[in-house]
Amino acid sequence: MTIPKKAKVVIIGGGVIGCSIAYHLGKIGWKDVVLLERKQLTCGTTWHAAGLIAQLRATKNMTRLAKYSQELYQKLEKETGLSTGFKRNGSITVALTNERMEELKRSAGMARAFGVEIDE
């Protein structure tokens, strides 16, 4: 593949962030975008990450971003025809002390306030 001599946007790094930027620019109609990766897409740090997407975060905006990411990964395979390997899993947290139980109850309340699906 020949690399263009110039582009409106040049993204260096084909990890999850670089690919996301290229994807979202393409979704809003940008055509003059080049993504540079020295090896294969997502073969660096992204490849070695656990790939867990817990929805509840410390702030509402970060929780919204995590929820959006999970929803996007669920639909990418259908949209692109490429397998993502994404599997939606839940999690279980156990409290061994009363203090930890109170902390989990506060987290559950925050999760509900942020629109995160939760079972107690």
Task: Cite the ranges covered by each PLM segment.
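Short, flexible hinge/linker loops that cap or flank conserved catalytic cores
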Residues: 1-4, 27, 86
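Beta1/beta-strand and adjacent pyrophosphate-binding region of the FAD-binding site
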Residues: 3-17, 34
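A secondary-structure boundary/capping signal
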Residues: 12, 37, 49, 88-90
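Hydrophobic alpha-helical packing residues
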Residues: 25-26, 111
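Glycine-rich FAD pyrophosphate-binding loop
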Residues: 26-47
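Dinucleotide-binding Rossmann-like beta1-alpha1 core, especially the glycine-rich loop
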Residues: 51-120
